[in-house]
Amino acid sequence: MTVYRPPSEANSFLLPLTIGCSHNGCTFCGNYLGVNFRIRRLEDIEKDIDSVARNYSGSVRRVFLENGDALIYRQRELVEVMKHLNRRFLNLERVGTYATPRSALIKSVDELRELRRLGLKIAYMGVETGDEELLLKINKGVTYDQIVEAGRKLKQAGITASVTVILGLGGVEGSEKHASQTAKILTDIDPDFVGALTIMLVPGTPLYRDYQEKRFKLISPLQSLIELKNIIQDSNYTSCFFTANHASNYLPIKVRLPERKEEILKLIDDILVNKETSQLRSESMRVL
């Protein structure tokens, strides 16, 4: 199976707790097409940890729990996984995980705090959009309010919240509302990190079929910059590191907000005013 991980977990020990995604219903996502979700046995996970620890007990500093939704793992057994990681890796600094909003909602704040005490320091959660109608259309499986509650719950437990949104997810017709409502939901969550990706169609997904049958029209590169600009312009954070450096994006950026908000908005505006597409990543270089 293909391994999916955030770019920031490139040097982490990748430890699968589940196979596939517990929701696996988003219309745009092809990561787990045809994969039946299952939770791995605790004893198999501990064997994986022991196998790596035999040679790397002192050098593993970061661990990333995968696949698509490791936080759904049963609390008692997840606690045992965390304890075993701490026993076997002497210099462990951080454990991270993917989390769906639903799995974050299932855990109580006290349960999340227990995981935080054991080293779960960051959770990566897909927000995608703040447009309630679009959340239904893409079959996200949660509402605007549930996503906000999930993000806030992670932060309340002391776990760093790193969320992703998808430029162009509403297509041309829904672009303006998607951007404005996404800025709103990001403001309401006030995450520590935001990663913006740009929509890329995956054959076999419902969204791809919508595109083929003319029900969905992709935005242009410059339209994606307008969305990016509006999201940054209309969202407010206590302190957030905002990136759009994923390989799907046309304009790679990394910026600390709110400190450099005006600077990054000017950069995007200059490209839009001058229609400087030469500064944008070419289609052939974009990948998921």
Predicted regions and their residues:
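Auxiliary Fe-S-binding modules of radical SAM enzymes
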Residues: 2-9, 184-288
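Hydrophobic faces of well-ordered beta-strands that scaffold small-molecule active sites
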Residues: 13-15, 63, 93-99, 123-125, ...
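Conserved, mostly hydrophobic/aromatic
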Residues: 21, 29, 45, 65, ...
